[in-house]
Amino acid sequence: MKKYILITVILINAVVFAQKGPKIEFKDKDNTIDYGTVNKDDDSGLRTFEFTNTGDEPLIITNVQSTCGCTVPSKPTEPIAPGKTGKIDVKYNMHTGPIRKTITVESNAVNVEEGRVAIKIKGEVIEKPVVNLLEKKKTSPMMQ
């Protein structure tokens, strides 16, 4: 009899504590996009994070906020239906140097603490190498 009571309590708890509601899952590993090493003048700095609502209710992104003004995120304006994907665009101002920025996404998702999840960008922006045409001319095989 004790076994039946225990099994009943476990089943009731499983049903009661099952998370219902919207859930956010990002496509990128560790919620991070790696720019790699990019030339300042050859890259717009725009990247897109894709996510899926794996829950059973519409997912609403209420806010996206960057750690600095050099990174400008934009959020979807419409709710994301269960099973559908959404996008968060991130535009980084291509300043020379390392990229290490965090964007906080706030939503009604039940699978992340307080509906917040951090997404990140990383990489390095370099100046385009300057080619010295005079040096090239001196080492040209035709000049020998």
Region locations from a protein language model:
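Short, solvent-exposed loop/turn segments enriched in Ser/Thr/Gly
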Residues: 42-48, 95-102
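Beta-sheet-dominated interaction scaffolds and their linkers
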Residues: 19-48, 128-144
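Asparagine-centered strand-capping/turn motif at beta-strand->loop junctions
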Residues: 51-55
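Extracellular/lumenal ectodomain signal focusing on beta-strand-rich modules
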Residues: 37, 61-63, 102
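Sec-dependent N-terminal signal peptides
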Residues: 4-13, 18
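Surface-exposed binding patches on compact interaction domains or structured appendages
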Residues: 56-85
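Terminal connector regions
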Residues: 98-131
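Short, hydrophobic beta-strand segments
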Residues: 88-95
